[in-house]
Amino acid sequence: MSGASARDATLLAFDYGEKRIGVAVGNALTRSARALVVIQNLNREHRFKAVGDLLAEWRPDALVVGLPMHPDGTPHDMTQQAKRFGNQLNGRFGLPVTWVDERYSSVEAEAGLRERNVRGRARAEMLDAEAARVILQQYLDQLSDHEHH
């Protein structure tokens, strides 16, 4: 993506996990992202039906997938699964996928929810979507950094 389309794009971001997939929505023009929903990762059919429903509702121009890494930057057990998920999204829905290093997204998400006094079960349920928001915000911030006008 380049030019005007990248700047006014609607984006969906995913924090892929074996049990849950956090989803966030954002806009490249306003550089804003918000936690959207958590998909229960029950099986492939359920996962892609839920994603398909979100894509139909939000009609994003591109997708962002968090890539889990160890703190030193080496691949993690989940790195390959997240990559496979992103490749499947691209193949199934034909939208461009960008991977974002998500090393500290869950830590940031937890801190953000704590700051807003979200507690207990509500915090546990929102954590994955909030992690997706952090991933998407990182991506949007990188877009800003690359646009030196």
Curated annotation (Swiss-Prot):
GO molecular function: nuclease activity
Keyword Nucleotidyltransferase assigned: no
Entry keyword set: Cytoplasm, Hydrolase, Nuclease, Ribosome biogenesis
Transmembrane stretches, start-end: none
InterPro entries to which the protein is assigned, alphabetical: RNaseH-like_sf, YqgF, YqgF/RNaseH-like_dom, YqgF/RNaseH-like_dom_sf
HAMAP family: Nuclease_YqgF
CDD domains xrefs: YqgF (cd16964)
First-listed, main subcellular location of the protein, grouped into a coarse class: cytoplasm
Protein name listed in UniProt: Putative pre-16S rRNA nuclease
Subcellular location: Cytoplasm
EC numbers for this chain: 3.1.-.-
Highest taxon of source: Bacteria
Matching SMART domains: YqgFc (SM00732)
Family: Belongs to the YqgF nuclease family.
Class of enzymatic activity (EC top level): hydrolase
Any GO BP: rRNA 5'-end processing
